[in-house]
Amino acid sequence: MEQVTKNVYAETKVRGCNPVYVVTSAGVVIIDTPQLPTYAVRMRKEAESHGQIKYLINTEHHVDHIFGNYYFRGAGIVVAHAETAANFKVVTPEINPYEYA
């Protein structure tokens, strides 16, 4: 992760989504998660080194934004549009996660 401002860190060298975490006085906010397991595990470890993860925000339903959520289980409240899960299931009803990892 690259530090882009004092409290904002982003994954800038991956194709697709650029996951971010923001360090606040109340805790850490994750914005989207990496789809690759190794990146997701590393992001969580780095983010937690700055404090407790309070929120995980998913900006959309595409796999490059949400697949890493699995590696953030129990790490704060997940925030997303009400249709995110429904859209994911409609667009990719029989997705093979190994095609994206």
Segments predicted by a language model, with ranges:
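Active-site HxH/HxHxD metal-binding segment of metal-dependent hydrolases
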Residues: K45-A101
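Conserved beta-strand hairpin/beta-sheet module of binuclear metal-dependent hydrolase folds
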Residues: E2-E48
